[in-house]
């Protein structure tokens, strides 16, 4: 009877740990919400016809370990807004309604970048790699996803008449 009780306790503890560590942070669950004061710190490009520019990025890195014929790869993915390269022309957002509309448009770029980060992680992390092809395929998968989302960012500007 004691073993059954111990097994139940162990099972509940294990389940609680799994649930606790399976939750992701808010940052992982949704794109970051931008605002003018925090995310647009660079000096505006006065030659640009645009009122604002949101610069985003995504990076991946990995460490690989080969042991015999076994390949183990640990990936890390990061991305988001680059405030020191993003800018807004403050005189162009003096009107509150225009400011909200423009910030909403720029948020769209952040949302697309978030999709890139999530899709990039899926496309790069969950592939079948071999010792002989992993470096080439990781790079090729990342380049393919980056190109797709770069084109999506451009289409977004065209479609929203930015």
Predicted regions and their residues:
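Bacterial Sec-dependent N-terminal signal peptides
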Residues: 1-29
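Residues in flexible loops and secondary-structure boundaries
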Residues: 9-12, 87-89, 110, 132
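Metalloprotease/metallohydrolase-associated module, dominated by Zn2+-dependent proteases
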Residues: 27-77, 81-90, 130-162
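Mid-length scaffold segments of soluble, non-membrane domains
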Residues: 80, 84-121
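Sec/Tat-exported extracytoplasmic proteins
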Residues: 106-107, 111, 120, 124, ...
